[in-house]
Each structure stands twice: as C-alpha cells, then as structure tokens.
Amino acid sequence: MKTILSGMLLVASSLSLYTTTSLAQGQTSSTIPATIVKEQRMQHISGKFDVKLNPQAAAPGIEAARLGRMTIDKQFHGDLQAHSLGEMLSAMGEIKGSAGYVAIERVSGTLMGKKGSFVLMHTGTMNRGQPQLTIQVVPDSGTEELTGLSGTMGIDIKDKQHFYNFDFVLP
C-alpha cells in the first residue's frame, strides 16, 4: 500500500510532532503523535580511583545479625574527577568464598567537565568464589549539570590498584 504524506504540524508548546497521513486506498486519515526526542548516546569512560574503607560498629540492637558495616571514601581520577562518600553493609556466607554486600555512595565533582553529583548503588555477591557485581546510577539522583544521568559502573582491582569503567547517558 502506498502511503501519501499529506501534512506535518509542529506543536511547539508541547514539543510534539503530529503527522497526518492518508492512505491511497480508502482515503483514511489519522493523526499520529510522535515526541521529539533529543538523541542520547551512550558514553564510556574509565580511570583510576583511590578508596578508603573504614569498619564501623554495628547499628545498636542488630549485633547478632553479624553484618559488616563500613564507610566509603573514594577519589575518582580521569574523566570523572570526583569525591564520593557512602556506606556499605556486608555479610559472609557459611561456606568459604560466599558473601554479599550492598552500598550507596554520593559522587560529587565533574563528569567530562560537567559539574554536579549523583548516587551509585552497589549490589555484589560472591558465590563460592564466583563474583557478580552491579553498580548503577540511582534514577533521578543527578544534580546540576548531571541532571538526568543514567548508567552503570564496573570495578576492576589489579595489583592493589582500583579502576572504574563507566557507561552512561547524559541528556
């Protein structure tokens, strides 16, 4: 079937594009809204970071849970020039090589020259020596020039040095 484009109307107030099309057969007409979307491209950066983990006492009343608690203090280098502060909770499994942790940290500084802050959420497990780690930007946590930031981060440790890989979209 041959489609004939019969008109376009740009509605600036709502940033919607309305396209009216007519079909050659049946002369049926319909209006189709399409949102104008600014192209967003995934970006990738990597670099080093320094980290200080400081053990903390268990929260009062939950000592029997045998959870580890630490503060996080990081300094990121490279295209992410930032400082982060956060907290981590961890638990060891009953079998050697099994454990888990969760952490939240607020990262403040510049990302490829754009200033602001955002929050990273960590979820990590070690299942009998096999690690699995997810670190993602908390939705809508970006501030200032980092508003709308989304993404995921990976961490590698080589020769006692810490490295990050950050895949992100910034509108």
Mark where each language-model region is:
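Targeting-peptide/extracellular-domain and disordered-appendage signature
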Residues: 4-5, 13-171
